[in-house]
């Protein structure tokens, strides 16, 4: 795997995870402390 491809994949994974944290945090279920 090329390093650039791996870098973009990692960046996308982090972005997706962060977006999920924000969405779940705004649902107000209180299970996540954001």
Swiss-Prot record:
| Keyword Ubl conjugation appears in the UniProt entry | no
Q: Where are the transmembrane segments?
A: 3-23
Where, subcellularly, is it found?
Answer: Cellular thylakoid membrane
* Alphabetical keyword list: Electron transport, Membrane, Photosynthesis, Thylakoid, Transmembrane, Transmembrane helix, Transport
**InterPro entries in the record:** Cytochr_b6-f_cplx_su8_sf (IPR036143), Cytochrome_b6-f_cplx_su8 (IPR005497)
The record's Gene Ontology biological-process terms are: cytochrome complex assembly; photosynthesis
Which membrane topology describes this protein?
A: Single-pass membrane protein
Decide whether keyword Transcription is in the record. Answer: no
Q: Which GO terms describe its molecular function?
A: electron transporter, transferring electrons within cytochrome b6/f complex of photosystem II activity
The record's annotation in Pfam families points to:
PetN
Of the GO CC terms on this record, one is: plasma membrane-derived thylakoid membrane
**What domain of life is recorded for the organism?**
Bacteria
UniProt subunit comment: The 4 large subunits of the cytochrome b6-f complex are cytochrome b6, subunit IV (17 kDa polypeptide, PetD), cytochrome f and the Rieske protein, while the 4 small subunits are PetG, PetL, PetM and PetN. The complex functions as a dimer.
Task performed by this protein: Component of the cytochrome b6-f complex, which mediates electron transfer between photosystem II (PSII) and photosystem I (PSI), cyclic electron flow around PSI, and state transitions.
Which family, according to UniProt?
Belongs to the PetN family.
Protein name as annotated: Cytochrome b6-f complex subunit 8
């Amino acid at each position: 795997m090329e390093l650039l491809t791996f870098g973009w994949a990692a960046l996308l994974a982090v972005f997706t995870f962060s977006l999920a944290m924000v969405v779940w945090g705004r649902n107000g279920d209180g299970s996540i402390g954001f």
